[in-house]
Amino acid sequence: MSSKQEKTKARLPRGFIDRTSAQLYATETMIAQIREVYELYGFEALETPIFEYTDVLGKFLPDEDRPNAGVFSLQDEDEQWMSLRYDLTAPLARYFAENFEILPKPYRSYRLGFVFRNEKPGPGRFRQFMQFDADIVGTPTVAADAEICMMAADSLEKLGFQHHDYVIRLNNRKILEAVLEQIGLVGREKAEKRLTVLRAIDKLDKFGLEGVRLLLGKGRLDESGDFTKGAQLKDQEIDSVLALLTGEAETAEETLDALRHVVGHHIQGLEGVRELEEMQAIFAANGYQNRIKIDPSVVRGLEYYTGPVFEATLLFDVLNDDGQKVVFGSIGGGGRYDGLVARFRGENVPATGFSIGISRLITALQNLSKLPVKKTPGPVVVLMMDREPEAVAQYQKMVMQLRKAGIRAELYLGASGIKAQMKYADRRQAPCVVIQGSQERQDRKIQIKDLIEGTRLSREIKDNQTWRESRPAQITVDEERLVQAVQDILISQNAQKF
């Protein structure tokens, strides 16, 4: 064994990311904007733990063939399995059922937090990501679904997206259920095949109609040589499914007529069309008809949806990993799930909701150059010119004076010299630095260097000697004028921005 201790390799787990100060600021700004819209619609905050008992979460995870294969799980001291939540909806169902007697009905809540998926990571596909959900539990009316859709549109506009940047795409799972019943996919024994069909339809934007046709049939071979087994439907059954996907027309009325034709006399299917018609009337009455559109290809991957389903899609182009232009795509979605709470209460409790993917939104806003950027400067840095205890106490006193005046400030606590300290201040984006050597301390004086003005003047003064002699953007003041002098510099810098 080597006497030299082996170093542990610093490495980030696959599928996870670190977030910088700038990213956190952008996230917090976006969250505040979305929260403002949610609360305007009457929703209240709720927080649930990131761990739930595994059986509470249920077996609803999309894109997984094996139950609970996509979750992170552990056993507690009682040998009960617990899992990290994979969405924010299943925990809400548990909370509502557990507190059924005391909660108002309908119950409007919003939840924000990280969710976890134990899936293969890839470009833009993470194992931990943030969602911001809003749900209405306890009402069967599709007016609730319509309100959720309108709130989703308002949230995107609050973030700076324009009408032409996005669309809320709307469908109804009852219509899809009608088509699946018409081709014989009913009963528990056909559950896996139904799920394969749902996944195939969900890939329409990615693979197109022909790709979906292959996935509904024997399967699809991608460019890398990987083969995805299909749903093994017959040609006539495939045609029935594709007829649904191509039902979108120029107007909402024409699309609804096409959907009526697809479902025929199927009672549940016709009910689904009627619900879409009711929602469309609400959108038209409130000026949302061009932002929320019926799209028969929307299915949503989760099995628990029972009625209207919706997806927020960004319409602008971005470059993919191969340098090709593609539509940015989905940044959130949701729908009605009337059976989820029934797992705990034995009776259906109507519910509907929407989830926004915060991480996807950040990427989208970056592409539009609309990501919130922190405009406030870094802290004022008091340099450590002398490390004698008396001097350090004086430096700390300066820092506290600035903080008490509401000015961000810090004392340089490293061991480097003046040159490295100035570089540190630049890296911290400090607006100015405070300097007091032994002579200044004896004279009760302080030097303050305006780094913003100094940078500007450095582009104008080319001669080093002139620069050293003029000491531009640097002033000397009495100790008692420290706060006022720094405030004057900050006011001047702020005025120059406008």
Curated annotation (Swiss-Prot):
It catalyses: tRNA(His) + L-histidine + ATP = L-histidyl-tRNA(His) + AMP + diphosphate + H(+). Its main location: cytoplasm. Gene3D superfamilies: Anticodon-binding domain, Bira Bifunctional Protein, Domain 2. Homodimer. This is Histidine--tRNA ligase. It comes from the Bacteria. Belongs to the class-II aminoacyl-tRNA synthetase family. Its EC number is 6.1.1.21. It comes from Bartonella quintana (strain Toulouse) (Rochalimaea quintana). The keyword Nucleotide-binding applies. One of its GO terms (biological process) is histidyl-tRNA aminoacylation. It holds the Pfam family HGTP_anticodon. Disulfide bonds: none annotated. It is an enzyme of class 6 (ligase). It is found in: Cytoplasm. GO terms for cellular component: cytoplasm. Keywords: Aminoacyl-tRNA synthetase, ATP-binding, Cytoplasm, Ligase, Nucleotide-binding, Protein biosynthesis. One of its GO terms (molecular function) is histidine-tRNA ligase activity.
